[in-house]
Curated annotation (Swiss-Prot):
Coiled coil: none annotated. Functions in the homeostasis of manganese ions. GO terms for cellular component: endoplasmic reticulum; Golgi membrane; late endosome; membrane; trans-Golgi network. Residues 24-67, 125-154, 205-217, 273-285 are cytoplasmic. The chain crosses the membrane at residues 3-23, 68-88, 104-124, 155-175, 184-204, 218-238, 252-272, 286-306. The lineage of its organism: Eukaryota, Fungi, Dikarya, Ascomycota, Saccharomycotina. Its main location: Golgi. This is Metal homeostasis factor ATX2. The keyword Transcription does not apply. It is found in: Golgi apparatus membrane. InterPro entries: ZIP, ZIP9. It comes from Saccharomyces cerevisiae (strain ATCC 204508 / S288c). Keywords: Golgi apparatus, Membrane, Transmembrane, Transmembrane helix.
Length: 313
């Protein structure tokens, strides 16, 4: 029964993230169609009307970016609050019960993701990938089925997608450590989902508008990114479901390590130091209705309230 729940939750994560990631693709296609329609009717439409349509499109894009920026700041607050108020306290409790070292586990979780992040950054910077799509151009879903190897090659060659794929795996591992704690699982799941929504929206927008990738390649990359967290979650959950003394000890220490990894994710996003987020950043290009600290604090307050509700139970 637990295994079925793991598969259903992983499927939900995959489908939800994938569908949300397709929204910018649909939105941009719709805007392009609108521009083409305006250009075709340019002879019969006044310059004033054309300029008005262009201004409307620009306003829509600006509004879209503001919403992503607000959601991104809110997600940072959720991750920060979840790390400090829920995952780390529960991890310390589990770690002490299994005679683990609190400081070492936190440090391993934090530095583990940091080192992995740096290795990915160094690898892609040395490679200096240039997007020359000479190999296979995906024109339809049939091309995707016929060339599965090219899908992974595109992932590895795309610096931003590859870095976010690795980051998604670490999120899934953090989620998998909470399999045996339902209340904590729900809160961590919500925090990760809210964190992934602006990431996948920005990723799709980046691939379409800046990298000029073809539609089906964008869809493939979005699907791979969407699958990263479910993969990490399923692997750790399956290990967690085997109730052996060794696995109990490992899971007890892994929960605190996952707290360290979540702390790294929230900290780097909070201070703007996450290297692969620079290309995805939209906050620097838009003016938010309120200061960004307002949205971060709102995000922090939700795990704070939930932590008191859980402690009362």
């Amino acid at each position: 029964m637990k295994f079925l729940g793991v598969i259903l939750l992983a499927s939900f994560l995959l489908i939800a993230t994938f569908l949300i990631g397709l929204i910018p693709l649909y939105y941009i296609d719709k805007q392009k169609s609108s521009i083409v329609t305006n250009q075709e009717g340019a002879d019969s439409i006044s310059d004033f009307t054309t300029n008005a349509d262009t201004q409307t499109i620009n306003d829509d894009v600006s509004s879209y970016r503001v919403k992503i920026a607000v959601l991104s700041q809110f997600g940072i607050g959720m991750l920060l609050g979840t790390s400090f108020m829920l995952v780390i306290p529960e991890g310390i409790k589990a770690c002490v019960e299994h005679d683990g070292n609190v400081g070492v586990n936190l440090l391993i979780g934090f530095l583990g993701v940091y080192v992995l992040d740096r290795l990915v950054t160094l690898w892609v910077s040395r490679k200096q990938t240039v997007y020359t799509h000479d190999a296979v151009k995906f024109q339809s879903w049939k091309d995707i089925i016929n060339h599965p190897r090219q899908i992974w090659m595109n992932l590895i060659q795309n610096n931003v997608v590859f870095a976010l794929f690795i980051h998604g795996l670490s999120d899934g591992i953090a989620l998998g450590t909470t399999t045996n704690n339902d209340s904590l699982l729900i809160v961590v799941l919500i925090a990760i989902v809210i964190h992934k929504i602006p990431a996948v929206l920005s990723l799709t927008s980046l691939m379409v508008s800046r990298q000029n990738l073809m539609k089906w390649e964008v869809i493939c990359n979005v699907f791979l990114f969407a699958s990263s967290t479910p993969i990490g979650y399923i692997v750790l959950s399956l290990l967690n479901l085997s109730h052996s003394p060794t696995m109990d000890w490992i899971s007890g220490n892994l929960l605190l390590m996952s707290g360290g990894s979540l702390l790294y994710a929230s900290f780097t996003a909070f201070v703007g130091g996450d290297s692969h987020d620079h290309d995805l950043s939209v906050e620097q290009e838009v003016v938010l209705p309120h200061d960004e600290s307002v949205y971060v604090l709102i995000g922090v307050c939700i795990p704070l309230v939930i932590s008191y509700c859980i402690s009362e139970e």
